[in-house]
């Protein structure tokens, strides 16, 4: 089996990465940062997201497992004190694959001047105006649903529903529900302008299309990473459940709701 490790960059994470690499090489596993079968992240969710995007082009061949040394560890199954146990499992135990849905984001430009850009998000994608309010038509399955006016919109995956979406008052969804959630950022609602004012949950076969109506520059993010878009020329942003899925290497049960409880409720 081929592996690679990704570190948060602090002293503890780097030391754990060195230990993992040394032990796995001694067990005749091959280190391959180009085509790994398993990616071991040591850090927080930021480290995990960076690793995910580094290998988003080979999700069918690569599985991920994380050790939590950062601030947030929603995607990490292990803590530093369990590193030796994880190493032993990787060497000796076939892992179970658990798959989570992803978000597909396609950005198109006015007049077809540039090629559409396709991205995958593990947590969410956001669109915000960099000057004034964002005004866009929201279409669902090709039908106009509403005209949004406000600071921006957040489109999240079920696992990403625990991140920015939660801060916006969105619901937490179990990853077995292949869906996307659309949440508003400071929408304008008065006797002239109306939006639903509530998060929307769309099933796998529904596509959501955002058509920009006002001539403003926008900022698009994928998992909080700024996307290099030509901000002044964005025409539409299409989101739906992606065909690809992220694959987690599970060596022991870690139910989703237990993960939610430990992240947000347990002291």
From Swiss-Prot:
It is found in: Cytoplasm. One of its GO terms (cellular component) is cytoplasm. It is an enzyme of class 2 (transferase). Pfam families: NAD_kinase, NAD_kinase_C. The active site is at residue 45. Its cofactor is a divalent metal cation. SUPFAM superfamilies: NAD kinase/diacylglycerol kinase-like (SSF111331). The keyword Transmembrane does not apply. Its EC number is 2.7.1.23. GO terms for molecular function: ATP binding; metal ion binding; NAD binding; NAD+ kinase activity. Keywords: ATP-binding, Cytoplasm, Kinase, NAD, NADP, Nucleotide-binding, Transferase. NAD(+) binds at residues 45-46, 123-124, 149, 151, 186, 226. One of its GO terms (biological process) is NADP biosynthetic process. It catalyses: NAD(+) + ATP = ADP + NADP(+) + H(+). InterPro entries: ATP-NAD_kinase_N, ATP-NAD_kinase_PpnK-typ_C, NAD/diacylglycerol_kinase_sf, NADK. NCBIfam families: PRK04885.1. Involved in the regulation of the intracellular balance of NAD and NADP, and is a key enzyme in the biosynthesis of NADP. Catalyzes specifically the phosphorylation on 2'-hydroxyl of the adenosine moiety of NAD to yield NADP. Belongs to the NAD kinase family. This is NAD kinase. The gene is nadK.
């Amino acid at each position: 089996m081929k592996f690679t490790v990704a570190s948060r960059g602090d002293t503890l994470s780097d030391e754990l990465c060195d230990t993992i690499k040394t032990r796995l090489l001694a067990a005749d596993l091959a280190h391959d940062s180009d085509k790994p079968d398993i990616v071991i992240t040591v850090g927080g969710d930021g480290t995990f997201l960076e690793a995910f995007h580094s290998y988003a082009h080979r999700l069918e061949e690569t599985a991920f497992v994380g050790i939590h040394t950062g601030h947030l560890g929603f995607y990490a199954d292990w803590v530093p004190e369990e590193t030796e146990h994880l190493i032993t499992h990787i060497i000796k135990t076939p892992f179970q694959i658990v798959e989570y849905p992803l978000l597909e984001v396609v950005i198109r430009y006015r007049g077809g001047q540039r090629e559409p850009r396709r991205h995958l998000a593990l947590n969410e994608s956001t669109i915000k105006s960099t000057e004034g309010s964002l005004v866009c038509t929201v279409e669902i399955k090709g039908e106009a649903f509403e005209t949004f006016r406000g600071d921006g919109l957040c489109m999240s995956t079920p696992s990403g529903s625990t991140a920015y979406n939660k801060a916006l008052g969105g619901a937490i969804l179990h990853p077995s529900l292949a869906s996307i959630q659309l949440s508003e950022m400071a929408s304008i609602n008065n006797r002239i302008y109306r939006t639903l004012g509530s998060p929307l949950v769309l099933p796998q076969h529904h596509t959501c299309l955002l058509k920009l109506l006002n001539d403003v520059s926008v900022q698009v993010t994928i998992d909080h990473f700024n996307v290099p878009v030509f901000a002044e020329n964005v025409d539409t942003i299409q989101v739906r459940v992606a065909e690809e899925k992220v694959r987690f290497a599970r060596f022991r049960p870690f139910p989703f709701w237990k993960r939610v409880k430990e992240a947000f409720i347990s002291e």
